[in-house]
């Protein structure tokens, strides 16, 4: 692997010409090297952005995510379903290497196989981040396992986030993965400001947070909430704050969870927790919310390593 190119293989093709005689080459100005064009899925994700060098030297160009409705245009905020995973896009697009970080949740394994065959046929290296060994959006793991059984053997190089994941990849597919831990997801200036506030704003309240956002298949808040409510109630000066999205907790929410909503309102009315119901938080509001907590409890059954965990780490929240 070549750290200077963001962890991608050295054997990525580049433009070159026939060797010139030594006496000519000595007097010839260095030819401009074509930048390495990387198609990353998704290109705007914080992990992918952190693969780039801090100082842009122009040696690597990362394509923007195409708009799913109009692939000729950059996607802006909406990148899913990813156009770059369509075999027809990979067959015609101008790029040197495809890096799949995540986003293949709904892609049939046969389509992924066709994609990898197109890449191999064009001589385009394929780098895969094994981001999830178990998909947090899937109740049943069969589809994700089948997708990985196509992608992992086909990849020219593998990246993963932890040594434990690398060991599992070695066990399941006999492949070695480069471990590149998840980078910070909160801007450095925001992290610094949060740490400074913590140093002088310590009060008598110990705030424990649980967030029941739009529920993934991997989330099971009711499995731990009764125990969490009882435990926090026994801690001197502790407050349990539960935040939830309107689509889960509002009476007309599109994904309302009736039993969860009823339990939370009952406990809030009894003074055993603070309940905050709101819409999706943008990054700034999310960082402020997490920084206000002493502990953030993750209600996951599987798929526990997430950007949420990394944000808490950066903001000093346990």
Question: What are the language-model segments listed below?
Answer:
Residues 288-304, 314-317:
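Acidic donor-binding loop of glycosyltransferase active sites
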Residues 76-80, 87-110, 125-127, 298-299:
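Short N-terminal targeting/anchoring amphipathic segment
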Residues 246, 253-288, 295:
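Nucleotide-activated donor-binding/catalytic signature segment of Leloir-type glycosyltransferases, i.e.
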Residues 199-222, 229, 240-243:
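Conserved donor-binding/catalytic core segment of Leloir-type glycosyltransferases
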Residues 153-170, 174-191, 203, 207:
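Donor nucleotide-sugar binding/catalytic pocket of nucleotide-sugar-dependent glycosyltransferases
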Residues 114-125, 141-157:
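Membrane-proximal helix-turn-helix segments that form the acceptor-binding/catalytic region
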Residues 28-31, 191-209, 232-237:
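Nucleotide-sugar donor-binding and catalytic loop/hinge architecture
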């Amino acid at each position: 692997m070549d750290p200077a190119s963001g962890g991608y293989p050295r054997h990525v093709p580049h433009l070159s010409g026939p060797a010139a005689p030594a006496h000519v080459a000595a007097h010839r100005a260095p030819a401009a090297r074509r930048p390495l064009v990387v198609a990353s899925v998704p290109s705007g994700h914080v992990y992918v952005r952190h693969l780039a060098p801090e100082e842009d030297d122009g040696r690597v160009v990362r394509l923007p995510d195409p708009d799913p409705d109009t692939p000729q245009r950059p996607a802006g905020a909406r990148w899913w379903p990813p156009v770059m995973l369509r075999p027809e896009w990979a067959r015609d697009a101008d790029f040197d290497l495809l890096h799949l970080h995540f986003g293949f949740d709904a892609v049939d394994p046969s389509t992924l196989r066709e994609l990898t065959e197109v890449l191999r046929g064009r001589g385009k290296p394929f780098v895969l981040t094994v981001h999830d060994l178990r998909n947090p959006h899937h109740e049943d793991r069969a589809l994700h396992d089948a997708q990985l059984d196509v992608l992992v053997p086909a990849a020219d190089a593998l990246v993963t986030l932890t040594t434990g994941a690398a060991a599992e990849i070695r066990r399941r597919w006999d492949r070695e993965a480069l471990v590149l831990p998840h980078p910070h997801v909160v801007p450095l200036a925001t992290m610094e400001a949060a740490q400074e506030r913590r140093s002088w704003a310590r009060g008598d309240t110990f705030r424990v947070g649980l967030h029941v956002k739009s529920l993934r298949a991997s989330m099971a808040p009711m499995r731990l909430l009764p125990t969490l409510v009882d435990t926090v109630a026994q801690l001197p000066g502790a407050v349990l704050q539960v935040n939830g999205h309107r689509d889960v907790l509002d009476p007309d929410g599109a994904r309302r969870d009736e039993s969860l909503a009823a339990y939370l309102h009952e406990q809030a009315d009894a003074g055993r927790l603070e309940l905050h119901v709101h819409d999706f938080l943008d990054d700034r509001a999310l960082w402020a919310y997490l920084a206000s907590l002493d502990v953030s409890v993750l209600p996951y059954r599987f798929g526990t390593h997430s950007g949420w965990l990394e944000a808490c780490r950066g903001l000093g929240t346990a």
